Protein backbone atom coordinates (compact mmCIF):
# COMPACT_ATOMS: atom_id res chain seq x y z
CA UNK A 1 0.00 0.00 0.00
CA UNK A 2 2.78 2.37 0.81
CA UNK A 3 4.56 2.08 -2.47
CA UNK A 4 1.24 2.46 -4.21
CA UNK A 5 0.40 5.62 -2.29
CA UNK A 6 3.86 7.02 -2.88
CA UNK A 7 3.59 6.32 -6.60
CA UNK A 8 0.16 7.93 -6.79
CA UNK A 9 1.48 10.98 -4.94
CA UNK A 10 4.35 11.29 -7.38
CA UNK A 11 1.96 11.00 -10.32
CA UNK A 12 -0.30 13.72 -8.87
CA UNK A 13 2.72 15.94 -8.28
CA UNK A 14 3.85 15.44 -11.87
CA UNK A 15 0.36 16.19 -13.09
CA UNK A 16 0.29 19.39 -11.05
CA UNK A 17 3.71 20.36 -12.29
CA UNK A 18 2.73 19.67 -15.90
CA UNK A 19 -0.67 21.40 -15.65
CA UNK A 20 0.85 24.68 -14.38
CA UNK A 21 2.96 25.48 -17.48
CA UNK A 22 0.17 24.31 -19.75
CA UNK A 23 -2.23 26.76 -18.12
CA UNK A 24 0.28 29.53 -18.35
CA UNK A 25 0.92 28.57 -21.90
CA UNK A 26 -2.81 28.63 -22.66
CA UNK A 27 -3.10 32.02 -21.08
CA UNK A 28 -0.12 33.13 -23.07
CA UNK A 29 -1.76 31.88 -26.18
CA UNK A 30 -4.81 33.92 -25.37
CA UNK A 31 -2.97 37.05 -24.33
CA UNK A 32 0.68 37.08 -25.37
CA UNK A 33 1.08 34.57 -28.20
CA UNK A 34 -2.11 35.48 -30.05
CA UNK A 35 -1.47 37.47 -33.17
CA UNK A 36 -4.12 40.01 -34.04
CA UNK A 37 -3.78 41.83 -37.29
CA UNK A 38 -6.17 44.64 -37.92
CA UNK A 39 -6.13 46.86 -40.93
CA UNK A 40 -7.82 50.16 -40.62
CA UNK A 41 -8.09 52.21 -43.71
CA UNK A 42 -8.77 55.87 -43.48
CA UNK A 43 -9.49 57.44 -46.79
CA UNK A 44 -10.20 60.91 -45.45
CA UNK A 45 -6.95 61.84 -43.69
CA UNK A 46 -4.03 62.93 -45.88
CA UNK A 47 -0.64 61.33 -45.51
CA UNK A 48 0.97 64.50 -44.24
CA UNK A 49 -1.12 64.52 -41.04
CA UNK A 50 0.48 61.34 -39.72
CA UNK A 51 3.52 61.51 -37.45
CA UNK A 52 6.85 61.54 -39.22
CA UNK A 53 9.31 60.92 -36.38
CA UNK A 54 10.55 57.49 -35.39
CA UNK A 55 10.84 56.21 -31.77
CA UNK A 56 13.56 53.65 -31.16
CA UNK A 57 12.70 50.35 -29.52
CA UNK A 58 13.06 50.15 -25.78
CA UNK A 59 13.73 46.43 -25.67
CA UNK A 60 15.52 43.91 -27.81
CA UNK A 61 13.58 40.88 -28.87
CA UNK A 62 15.23 37.62 -29.70
CA UNK A 63 14.95 36.77 -33.38
CA UNK A 64 12.27 34.31 -34.17
CA UNK A 65 12.51 32.60 -37.57
CA UNK A 66 9.18 33.17 -39.17
CA UNK A 67 8.15 32.90 -42.82
CA UNK A 68 5.17 34.82 -44.06
CA UNK A 69 3.13 33.94 -47.08
CA UNK A 70 0.73 36.48 -48.48
CA UNK A 71 -1.60 36.33 -51.42
CA UNK A 72 -3.95 38.82 -52.94
CA UNK A 73 -7.10 37.01 -53.98
CA UNK A 74 -8.89 40.21 -54.92
CA UNK A 75 -7.62 41.47 -58.32
CA UNK A 76 -9.24 44.87 -57.70
CA UNK A 77 -7.48 45.49 -54.42
CA UNK A 78 -7.12 49.21 -53.84
CA UNK A 79 -4.25 51.04 -52.20
CA UNK A 80 -4.42 53.59 -49.45
CA UNK A 81 -1.50 55.78 -48.49
CA UNK A 82 -3.18 56.57 -45.16
CA UNK A 83 -3.83 52.98 -43.97
CA UNK A 84 -2.47 51.95 -40.59
CA UNK A 85 -1.50 48.41 -39.53
CA UNK A 86 -1.26 47.33 -35.90
CA UNK A 87 0.44 44.03 -35.14
CA UNK A 88 0.68 42.40 -31.73
CA UNK A 89 3.15 39.56 -31.48
CA UNK A 90 4.88 37.49 -28.84
CA UNK A 91 8.53 36.76 -29.55
CA UNK A 92 9.34 34.74 -26.41
CA UNK A 93 6.69 32.02 -26.18
CA UNK A 94 7.08 28.69 -27.97
CA UNK A 95 4.27 26.28 -28.15
CA UNK A 96 5.09 22.84 -26.75
CA UNK A 97 1.65 21.44 -26.15
CA UNK A 98 -1.15 20.50 -28.46
CA UNK A 99 -3.59 23.06 -27.11
CA UNK A 100 -5.53 24.96 -29.74
CA UNK A 101 -5.93 28.76 -29.81
CA UNK A 102 -8.04 30.76 -32.22
CA UNK A 103 -6.50 33.91 -33.69
CA UNK A 104 -8.91 36.37 -35.34
CA UNK A 105 -7.33 38.04 -38.33
CA UNK A 106 -9.02 40.88 -40.17
CA UNK A 107 -7.93 41.39 -43.76
CA UNK A 108 -8.46 44.34 -46.08
CA UNK A 109 -11.38 42.63 -47.75
CA UNK A 110 -13.25 42.31 -44.45
CA UNK A 111 -12.81 38.50 -44.03
CA UNK A 112 -11.82 36.95 -40.69
CA UNK A 113 -9.36 34.06 -40.72
CA UNK A 114 -9.09 31.73 -37.73
CA UNK A 115 -5.89 29.80 -37.24
CA UNK A 116 -5.17 27.06 -34.75
CA UNK A 117 -2.09 26.53 -32.71
CA UNK A 118 -1.24 23.19 -34.14
CA UNK A 119 1.76 22.62 -36.34
CA UNK A 120 -0.41 21.51 -39.24
CA UNK A 121 -2.49 24.73 -39.38
CA UNK A 122 -2.11 27.09 -42.34
CA UNK A 123 -2.69 30.81 -42.20
CA UNK A 124 -3.59 32.80 -45.30
CA UNK A 125 -3.89 36.56 -44.95
CA UNK A 126 -4.88 39.01 -47.69
CA UNK A 127 -2.50 41.94 -47.70
CA UNK A 128 -3.19 45.39 -49.12
CA UNK A 129 -0.86 46.38 -51.90
CA UNK A 130 0.28 49.58 -50.15
CA UNK A 131 1.35 49.76 -46.55
CA UNK A 132 0.95 52.97 -44.59
CA UNK A 133 2.54 53.87 -41.28
CA UNK A 134 2.92 50.72 -39.17
CA UNK A 135 2.59 50.76 -35.40
CA UNK A 136 3.92 47.46 -34.00
CA UNK A 137 3.67 46.85 -30.26
CA UNK A 138 4.40 43.68 -28.34
CA UNK A 139 2.58 43.20 -25.08
CA UNK A 140 4.41 40.78 -22.81
CA UNK A 141 4.16 41.23 -19.03
CA UNK A 142 7.41 43.14 -18.57
CA UNK A 143 8.37 44.27 -22.11
CA UNK A 144 6.96 47.30 -23.94
CA UNK A 145 8.21 47.71 -27.48
CA UNK A 146 6.76 50.41 -29.67
CA UNK A 147 7.92 51.14 -33.17
CA UNK A 148 6.60 53.97 -35.31
CA UNK A 149 7.57 54.33 -38.89
CA UNK A 150 7.59 57.63 -40.77
CA UNK A 151 4.30 58.66 -42.24
CA UNK A 152 5.61 58.85 -45.74
CA UNK A 153 3.90 56.61 -48.31
CA UNK A 154 5.49 53.22 -48.81
CA UNK A 155 5.93 51.21 -51.97
CA UNK A 156 5.83 47.45 -52.22
CA UNK A 157 5.90 44.70 -54.79
CA UNK A 158 3.16 42.10 -54.93
CA UNK A 159 2.94 38.81 -56.69
CA UNK A 160 -0.64 39.20 -57.84
CA UNK A 161 -0.85 39.05 -61.65
CA UNK A 162 -3.52 40.93 -63.58
CA UNK A 163 -3.61 43.61 -60.88
CA UNK A 164 -2.74 47.26 -61.54
CA UNK A 165 -0.36 48.68 -59.00
CA UNK A 166 -0.46 52.29 -57.88
CA UNK A 167 2.02 53.78 -55.44
CA UNK A 168 2.75 57.12 -53.86
CA UNK A 169 5.95 59.02 -54.40
CA UNK A 170 8.25 59.39 -51.42
CA UNK A 171 10.36 57.07 -49.32
CA UNK A 172 9.69 53.42 -49.94
CA UNK A 173 9.52 50.10 -48.19
CA UNK A 174 9.87 46.89 -50.16
CA UNK A 175 7.90 43.81 -49.17
CA UNK A 176 8.48 40.59 -51.08
CA UNK A 177 5.55 38.20 -51.04
CA UNK A 178 4.62 35.00 -52.85
CA UNK A 179 1.26 33.36 -53.31
CA UNK A 180 1.80 30.29 -51.15
CA UNK A 181 0.56 29.19 -47.70
CA UNK A 182 3.12 28.59 -44.92
CA UNK A 183 2.61 26.41 -41.87
CA UNK A 184 4.41 27.19 -38.62
CA UNK A 185 5.90 24.31 -36.68
CA UNK A 186 5.43 25.38 -33.11
CA UNK A 187 3.63 28.72 -33.00
CA UNK A 188 1.12 30.86 -34.88
CA UNK A 189 3.00 34.14 -34.64
CA UNK A 190 2.51 36.53 -37.57
CA UNK A 191 5.22 39.08 -38.30
CA UNK A 192 5.42 41.92 -40.79
CA UNK A 193 8.90 41.94 -42.32
CA UNK A 194 9.49 45.59 -43.18
CA UNK A 195 12.52 47.28 -44.59
CA UNK A 196 12.56 50.81 -43.27
CA UNK A 197 13.61 53.46 -45.74
CA UNK A 198 15.86 56.44 -45.14
CA UNK A 199 14.98 58.94 -42.44
CA UNK A 200 12.65 61.83 -43.08
CA UNK A 201 14.28 64.81 -44.68
CA UNK A 202 16.44 63.00 -47.21
CA UNK A 203 15.53 63.14 -50.88
CA UNK A 204 16.61 61.12 -53.87
CA UNK A 205 16.30 61.57 -57.58
CA UNK A 206 14.94 58.17 -58.57
CA UNK A 207 14.40 54.94 -56.68
CA UNK A 208 14.25 51.62 -58.53
CA UNK A 209 11.26 49.45 -57.71
CA UNK A 210 11.24 45.77 -58.50
CA UNK A 211 7.80 44.45 -59.44
CA UNK A 212 7.77 40.68 -59.15
CA UNK A 213 5.31 38.68 -61.20
CA UNK A 214 5.26 34.96 -61.86
CA UNK A 215 7.96 34.44 -64.47
CA UNK A 216 8.41 38.11 -65.54
CA UNK A 217 10.22 40.90 -63.75
CA UNK A 218 10.14 44.48 -65.00
CA UNK A 219 12.22 47.17 -63.29
CA UNK A 220 10.44 50.49 -62.93
CA UNK A 221 12.18 53.72 -61.98
CA UNK A 222 10.05 56.50 -60.54
CA UNK A 223 11.17 59.96 -59.45
CA UNK A 224 10.82 60.72 -55.75
CA UNK A 225 9.92 64.02 -54.16
CA UNK A 226 11.25 65.37 -50.86
CA UNK A 227 9.43 64.01 -47.84
CA UNK A 228 8.47 67.44 -46.57
CA UNK A 229 6.45 68.31 -49.67
CA UNK A 230 3.16 66.49 -50.32
CA UNK A 231 3.42 64.24 -53.33
CA UNK A 232 0.61 62.98 -55.49
CA UNK A 233 -0.04 59.44 -56.57
CA UNK A 234 1.24 58.01 -59.82
CA UNK A 235 -0.09 54.95 -61.60
CA UNK A 236 2.57 52.44 -62.56
CA UNK A 237 1.46 49.85 -65.09
CA UNK A 238 2.26 46.24 -64.38
CA UNK A 239 4.48 44.03 -66.47
CA UNK A 240 1.53 42.76 -68.47
CA UNK A 241 0.49 46.29 -69.43
CA UNK A 242 4.06 47.15 -70.46
CA UNK A 243 4.20 44.05 -72.62
CA UNK A 244 0.90 44.89 -74.30
CA UNK A 245 1.85 48.47 -75.09
CA UNK A 246 5.23 47.43 -76.46
CA UNK A 247 3.79 44.80 -78.75
CA UNK A 248 1.25 47.24 -80.27
CA UNK A 249 3.93 49.79 -81.24
CA UNK A 250 5.36 49.40 -84.70
CA UNK A 251 7.97 51.74 -86.21
CA UNK A 252 6.84 53.81 -89.20
CA UNK A 253 9.24 53.62 -92.12
CA UNK A 254 8.97 56.51 -94.53
CA UNK A 255 8.19 55.16 -97.95
CA UNK A 256 8.78 56.98 -101.21
CA UNK A 257 11.73 58.39 -103.15
CA UNK A 258 14.77 59.32 -101.15
CA UNK A 259 16.16 61.79 -103.67
CA UNK A 260 17.25 64.90 -101.77
CA UNK A 261 15.98 68.27 -102.95
CA UNK A 262 18.51 70.55 -104.63
CA UNK A 263 18.50 74.28 -105.37
CA UNK A 264 20.20 76.25 -108.13
CA UNK A 265 20.48 80.03 -108.33
CA UNK A 266 21.51 81.91 -111.45
CA UNK A 267 21.01 85.66 -111.56
CA UNK A 268 17.31 86.39 -111.23
CA UNK A 269 16.34 82.72 -111.50
CA UNK A 270 16.07 80.28 -108.63
CA UNK A 271 15.23 76.63 -109.19
CA UNK A 272 14.35 74.07 -106.55
CA UNK A 273 14.15 70.40 -107.50
CA UNK A 274 12.01 68.31 -105.14
CA UNK A 275 12.22 64.52 -104.83
CA UNK A 276 10.70 62.46 -107.61
CA UNK A 277 6.95 62.01 -107.45
CA UNK A 278 4.32 59.96 -109.20
CA UNK A 279 2.26 61.63 -111.92
CA UNK A 280 -1.38 62.51 -111.40
CA UNK A 281 -3.99 64.61 -113.14
CA UNK A 282 -3.48 67.86 -111.22
CA UNK A 283 0.20 68.19 -112.13
CA UNK A 284 1.58 70.21 -115.04
CA UNK A 285 4.03 67.75 -116.61
CA UNK A 286 6.62 68.68 -119.23
CA UNK A 287 8.23 65.85 -121.17
CA UNK A 288 11.91 66.40 -121.90
CA UNK A 289 14.26 65.06 -124.52
CA UNK A 290 17.03 64.64 -121.98
CA UNK A 291 16.91 62.98 -118.62
CA UNK A 292 19.54 65.23 -117.08
CA UNK A 293 17.12 67.82 -115.71
CA UNK A 294 17.03 67.84 -111.90
CA UNK A 295 19.57 65.00 -111.96
CA UNK A 296 22.50 66.95 -110.61
CA UNK A 297 23.39 68.99 -113.68
CA UNK A 298 22.71 72.75 -113.78
CA UNK A 299 19.40 73.68 -115.42
CA UNK A 300 18.96 75.32 -118.80
CA UNK A 301 18.58 79.07 -118.28
CA UNK A 302 16.56 79.47 -121.47
CA UNK A 303 14.05 76.94 -120.19
CA UNK A 304 13.70 78.85 -116.93
CA UNK A 305 13.30 82.16 -118.76
CA UNK A 306 10.46 80.78 -120.86
CA UNK A 307 8.66 79.49 -117.78
CA UNK A 308 9.02 82.84 -116.00
CA UNK A 309 7.83 84.81 -119.05
CA UNK A 310 4.82 82.53 -119.32
CA UNK A 311 3.88 83.39 -115.75
CA UNK A 312 4.40 87.16 -116.29
CA UNK A 313 4.51 88.62 -119.77
CA UNK A 314 6.30 91.77 -118.58
CA UNK A 315 8.98 89.84 -116.72
CA UNK A 316 12.25 91.77 -116.59
CA UNK A 317 15.29 90.06 -115.10
CA UNK A 318 16.66 93.44 -113.99
CA UNK A 319 13.59 94.24 -111.89
CA UNK A 320 12.00 90.86 -111.20
CA UNK A 321 13.13 87.58 -109.73
CA UNK A 322 11.65 84.21 -110.57
CA UNK A 323 11.55 81.16 -108.28
CA UNK A 324 10.50 77.80 -109.71
CA UNK A 325 9.74 74.54 -107.94
CA UNK A 326 9.96 71.44 -110.09
CA UNK A 327 9.90 67.72 -109.41
CA UNK A 328 10.98 64.88 -111.69
CA UNK A 329 8.53 62.14 -112.55
CA UNK A 330 9.35 58.60 -111.50
CA UNK A 331 10.52 56.34 -114.32
CA UNK A 332 9.98 59.02 -116.96
CA UNK A 333 11.93 61.79 -118.70
CA UNK A 334 9.57 64.50 -117.52
CA UNK A 335 9.29 67.14 -114.83
CA UNK A 336 6.27 68.51 -113.02
CA UNK A 337 5.91 72.26 -112.56
CA UNK A 338 4.69 72.62 -109.00
CA UNK A 339 5.08 76.36 -108.41
CA UNK A 340 6.24 79.56 -110.14
CA UNK A 341 6.74 82.66 -108.00
CA UNK A 342 7.49 86.06 -109.58
CA UNK A 343 8.86 88.71 -107.25
CA UNK A 344 8.73 92.26 -108.59
CA UNK A 345 11.20 94.78 -107.17
CA UNK A 346 9.56 98.22 -107.27
CA UNK A 347 11.28 101.44 -106.26
CA UNK A 348 9.56 103.70 -103.72
CA UNK A 349 9.01 106.30 -106.44
CA UNK A 350 7.13 103.81 -108.60
CA UNK A 351 5.00 102.70 -105.69
CA UNK A 352 4.25 106.33 -104.82
CA UNK A 353 3.10 107.08 -108.34
CA UNK A 354 0.87 104.02 -108.32
CA UNK A 355 -0.66 105.02 -105.01
CA UNK A 356 -1.28 108.57 -106.14
CA UNK A 357 -3.55 107.26 -108.86
CA UNK A 358 -5.59 105.42 -106.22
CA UNK A 359 -5.57 108.12 -103.56
CA UNK A 360 -9.37 108.20 -103.30
CA UNK A 361 -9.46 104.47 -102.59
CA UNK A 362 -6.71 104.88 -100.01
CA UNK A 363 -8.67 107.65 -98.31
CA UNK A 364 -11.71 105.38 -98.07
CA UNK A 365 -9.49 102.65 -96.65
CA UNK A 366 -8.38 104.98 -93.85
CA UNK A 367 -5.12 106.48 -95.17
CA UNK A 368 -4.79 110.10 -94.09
CA UNK A 369 -1.49 111.22 -95.57
CA UNK A 370 1.30 109.95 -97.80
CA UNK A 371 4.73 111.45 -98.32
CA UNK A 372 7.80 110.62 -100.34
CA UNK A 373 10.50 113.16 -99.63
CA UNK A 374 8.95 116.55 -100.31
CA UNK A 375 6.06 115.12 -102.29
CA UNK A 376 2.75 114.60 -100.62
CA UNK A 377 -0.78 113.55 -101.47
CA UNK A 378 -2.27 114.70 -104.79
CA UNK A 379 -4.60 117.20 -103.10
CA UNK A 380 -1.68 119.06 -101.49
CA UNK A 381 0.19 119.53 -104.78
CA UNK A 382 -2.83 120.98 -106.65
CA UNK A 383 -4.00 124.67 -106.30
CA UNK A 384 -7.29 124.67 -104.48
CA UNK A 385 -8.28 128.04 -106.03
CA UNK A 386 -7.48 127.14 -109.63
CA UNK A 387 -11.00 126.17 -110.60
CA UNK A 388 -12.70 129.22 -109.08
CA UNK A 389 -10.05 131.44 -110.62
CA UNK A 390 -10.62 129.97 -114.04
CA UNK A 391 -14.36 130.43 -113.66
CA UNK A 392 -13.86 134.06 -112.62
CA UNK A 393 -11.59 134.80 -115.55
CA UNK A 394 -14.04 133.29 -118.03
CA UNK A 395 -16.92 135.25 -116.54
CA UNK A 396 -15.02 138.53 -116.64
CA UNK A 397 -13.98 137.99 -120.25
CA UNK A 398 -17.54 137.27 -121.23
CA UNK A 399 -18.71 140.38 -119.45
CA UNK A 400 -16.10 142.53 -121.16
CA UNK A 401 -17.11 141.17 -124.55
CA UNK A 402 -20.73 141.93 -123.79
CA UNK A 403 -19.91 145.49 -122.73
CA UNK A 404 -17.85 146.05 -125.86
CA UNK A 405 -20.70 144.83 -128.05
CA UNK A 406 -23.17 147.11 -126.33
CA UNK A 407 -20.84 150.09 -126.64
CA UNK A 408 -20.34 149.47 -130.36
CA UNK A 409 -24.06 149.30 -131.00
CA UNK A 410 -24.76 152.47 -129.05
CA UNK A 411 -21.95 154.41 -130.73
CA UNK A 412 -23.19 153.43 -134.20
CA UNK A 413 -26.70 154.57 -133.43
CA UNK A 414 -25.49 157.91 -132.12
CA UNK A 415 -23.40 158.56 -135.23
CA UNK A 416 -26.30 157.74 -137.53
CA UNK A 417 -28.57 160.11 -135.65
CA UNK A 418 -26.04 162.92 -135.99
CA UNK A 419 -25.80 162.43 -139.76
CA UNK A 420 -29.54 162.48 -140.20
CA UNK A 421 -29.87 165.63 -138.11
CA UNK A 422 -27.24 167.49 -140.17
CA UNK A 423 -28.90 166.61 -143.46
CA UNK A 424 -32.27 167.70 -142.16
CA UNK A 425 -30.91 171.08 -141.14
CA UNK A 426 -29.34 171.64 -144.59
CA UNK A 427 -32.55 170.85 -146.37
CA UNK A 428 -34.47 173.24 -144.21
CA UNK A 429 -31.94 176.02 -144.92
CA UNK A 430 -32.20 175.58 -148.71
CA UNK A 431 -35.96 175.65 -148.60
CA UNK A 432 -36.04 178.90 -146.62
CA UNK A 433 -33.73 180.66 -149.15
CA UNK A 434 -30.98 181.59 -146.83
CA UNK A 435 -27.66 181.18 -148.68
CA UNK A 436 -24.43 182.15 -147.13
CA UNK A 437 -22.63 181.49 -150.38
CA UNK A 438 -24.93 181.64 -153.35
CA UNK A 439 -22.24 180.56 -155.77
CA UNK A 440 -21.64 177.41 -153.81
CA UNK A 441 -25.31 176.83 -153.48
CA UNK A 442 -25.84 177.15 -157.22
CA UNK A 443 -22.87 174.99 -157.97
CA UNK A 444 -23.98 172.36 -155.52
CA UNK A 445 -27.37 172.00 -157.15
CA UNK A 446 -26.97 172.51 -160.91
CA UNK A 447 -29.21 169.64 -161.77
CA UNK A 448 -32.18 171.27 -160.19
CA UNK A 449 -31.98 174.39 -162.39
CA UNK A 450 -31.07 172.58 -165.61
CA UNK A 451 -33.80 172.19 -168.19
CA UNK A 452 -33.40 170.07 -171.25
CA UNK A 453 -35.60 167.99 -173.36
CA UNK A 454 -35.16 164.35 -173.06
CA UNK A 455 -34.78 162.45 -176.29
CA UNK A 456 -36.50 159.11 -176.33
CA UNK A 457 -34.94 156.07 -177.61
CA UNK A 458 -36.85 156.42 -180.84
CA UNK A 459 -35.45 159.89 -181.44
CA UNK A 460 -38.60 161.70 -180.50
CA UNK A 461 -38.71 164.58 -178.08
CA UNK A 462 -40.35 163.92 -174.80
CA UNK A 463 -42.44 166.14 -172.65
CA UNK A 464 -39.85 166.10 -169.84
CA UNK A 465 -37.39 168.94 -169.69
CA UNK A 466 -35.27 167.52 -166.79
CA UNK A 467 -32.19 165.75 -167.97
CA UNK A 468 -29.83 163.81 -165.71
CA UNK A 469 -26.51 165.43 -165.04
CA UNK A 470 -24.57 162.49 -166.25
CA UNK A 471 -25.91 162.81 -169.76
CA UNK A 472 -24.89 166.46 -170.07
CA UNK A 473 -21.77 167.36 -171.96
CA UNK A 474 -19.23 169.96 -171.02
CA UNK A 475 -20.48 172.32 -173.68
CA UNK A 476 -23.98 172.18 -172.31
CA UNK A 477 -22.73 173.05 -168.92
CA UNK A 478 -20.85 176.08 -170.23
CA UNK A 479 -23.85 177.34 -172.05
CA UNK A 480 -26.00 177.03 -169.01
CA UNK A 481 -23.50 178.89 -166.95
CA UNK A 482 -23.37 181.72 -169.43
CA UNK A 483 -27.08 181.96 -169.67
CA UNK A 484 -27.39 182.07 -165.95
CA UNK A 485 -24.99 184.90 -165.66
Swiss-Prot record:
> Residue ranges, Cytoplasmic compartment?
408-485
Q: Which residues form a coiled coil?
A: none
Note whether Phosphoprotein occurs among the keywords.
yes
Q: Per the record, what ranges lie on the membrane's Extracellular side?
A: 25-386
Q: Which Pfam families match?
A: CD34_antigen
Chain segments carrying region Disordered = 22-267
InterPro entries from the entry? CD34/Podocalyxin, PODXL
Regions that span the bilayer: 387-407
| Major localisation | membrane
Q: Name one GO cellular component term.
A: lamellipodium
Write the record's keywords in alphabetical order, separated by commas.
Cell adhesion, Cell membrane, Cell projection, Glycoprotein, Membrane, Phosphoprotein, Signal, Transmembrane, Transmembrane helix
Q: Which GO terms describe its biological process?
A: cell adhesion; cell migration; epithelial tube formation; glomerular filtration; leukocyte migration; negative regulation of cell adhesion; negative regulation of cell-cell adhesion; podocyte development
PTM details? N- and O-linked glycosylated. Sialoglycoprotein.
Q: Where is the composition biased (Low complexity)?
A: 58-109, 150-161, 254-267
Known glycosylation sites = 29, 82, 135, 144, 156, 187, 287
Where are the Phosphoserine modifications? 464
- Using the record's annotations, give every residue carrying the modification Phosphothreonine: 445, 483
The answer to whether UniProt assigns keyword tRNA-binding to this entry is no
Q: Relay the domain remarks.
A: Both the O-glycan-rich domain of the extracellular domain and the C-terminus PDZ-binding motif (DTHL) in the cytoplasmic tail harbor an apical sorting signal. The cytoplasmic domain is necessary for the apical membrane targeting and renal tubulogenesis. The large highly anionic extracellular domain allows to maintain open filtration pathways between neighboring podocyte foot processes. The cytoplasmic C-terminus PDZ-binding motif (DTHL) is essential for interaction with NHERF1 and for targeting NHERF1 to the apical cell membrane. The extracellular domain is necessary for microvillus formation.
Its assembly, as annotated, is: Monomer; when associated with the membrane raft. Oligomer; when integrated in the apical membrane. Interacts with NHERF2. Interacts (via the C-terminal PDZ-binding motif DTHL) with NHERF1 (via the PDZ domains); the interaction take place early in the secretory pathway and is necessary for its apical membrane sorting. Found in a complex with EZR, PODXL and NHERF2. Associates with the actin cytoskeleton through complex formation with EZR and NHERF2.
Which PANTHER family does this entry report, sorted A to Z? PODOCALYXIN
Family assignment?
Belongs to the podocalyxin family.
The name this protein goes by in its record? Podocalyxin
Q: Give the organism the record lists.
A: Rattus norvegicus (Rat)
Q: What is the lineage of its organism?
A: Eukaryota, Metazoa, Chordata, Craniata, Vertebrata
Q: Which gene encodes it?
A: Podxl
Amino acid sequence: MRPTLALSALLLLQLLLLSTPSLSQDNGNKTDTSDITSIDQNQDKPATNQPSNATPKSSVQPPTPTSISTSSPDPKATQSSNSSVTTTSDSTTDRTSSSTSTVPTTSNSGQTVSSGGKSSDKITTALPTTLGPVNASSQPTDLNTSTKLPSTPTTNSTASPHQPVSHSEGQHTTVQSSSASVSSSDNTTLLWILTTSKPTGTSEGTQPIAISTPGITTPVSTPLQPTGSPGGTESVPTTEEFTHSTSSWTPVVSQGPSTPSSTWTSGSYKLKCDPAIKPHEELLILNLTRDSFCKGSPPNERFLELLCHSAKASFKPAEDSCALELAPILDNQAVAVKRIVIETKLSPKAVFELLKDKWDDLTEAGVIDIHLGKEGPPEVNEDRFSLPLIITIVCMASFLLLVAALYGCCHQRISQRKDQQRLTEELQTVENGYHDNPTLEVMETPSEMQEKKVVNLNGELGDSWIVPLDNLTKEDLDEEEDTHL
